[in-house]
């Protein structure tokens, strides 16, 4: 197994969190009363129980580096995630950033911000 780091994100309700991410191709790898791990290909997200979380006040976030950001964005839209400036869940379209990369954003039902970054910028870095 390769060494890796995974984000630890809050979930108000594991059933709801799993249902949301399963629509985006993630599957449950592990789950008990206080912890859940979801995986989609090489992407892994870990969730801890946080039933009292206020999604509007959440400051949790992480970055997902994707080989095909445009396809993941299309998948989010195809399952009904709205492109809007407020509320949750929501998606923000991919845009070229000043730093040279392409980035979109997904806010999940618990108010967690997932920055979606196209991998191309890191292709030449080893």
Curated annotation (Swiss-Prot):
It comes from the Bacteria. The lineage of its organism: Bacteria, Pseudomonadati, Pseudomonadota, Gammaproteobacteria, Enterobacterales. The gene is ble. The keyword Iron-sulfur does not apply. Keywords: Antibiotic resistance, Transposable element. PROSITE patterns: VOC. Residues 1-119 form the VOC domain. InterPro entries: Bleomycin-R, Glyas_Bleomycin-R_OHBP_Dase, Glyas_Fos-R_dOase_dom, VOC. Gene3D superfamilies: 2,3-Dihydroxybiphenyl 1,2-Dioxygenase, domain 1 (3.10.180.10). It comes from Klebsiella pneumoniae. GO terms for biological process: response to antibiotic. Binding protein with a strong affinity to the bleomycin family of antibiotics. Binds to CL990; an antimitotic-antibiotic compound. Belongs to the bleomycin resistance protein family. This enzyme is encoded by the kanamycin and neomycin resistance transposon Tn5. The keyword Ribosomal protein does not apply. This is Bleomycin resistance protein.
């Amino acid at each position: 197994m390769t060494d890796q780091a995974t984000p630890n994100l809050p979930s108000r309700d594991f059933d709801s969190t799993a249902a949301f991410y399963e629509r985006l191709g993630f599957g449950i790898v592990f789950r008990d009363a206080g912890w859940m791990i979801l995986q989609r290909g090489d992407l892994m997200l870990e969730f801890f129980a946080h039933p009292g979380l206020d999604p509007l006040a959440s400051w949790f976030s992480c970055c997902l580096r994707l080989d095909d950001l445009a396809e993941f964005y299309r998948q989010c839209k195809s399952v009904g995630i709205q492109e809007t400036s407020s509320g949750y869940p929501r998606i923000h379209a991919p845009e070229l950033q000043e730093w040279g990369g392409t980035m979109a954003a997904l806010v999940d039902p618990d108010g967690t911000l997932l920055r979606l970054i196209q991998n191309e910028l890191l292709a030449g870095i080893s």
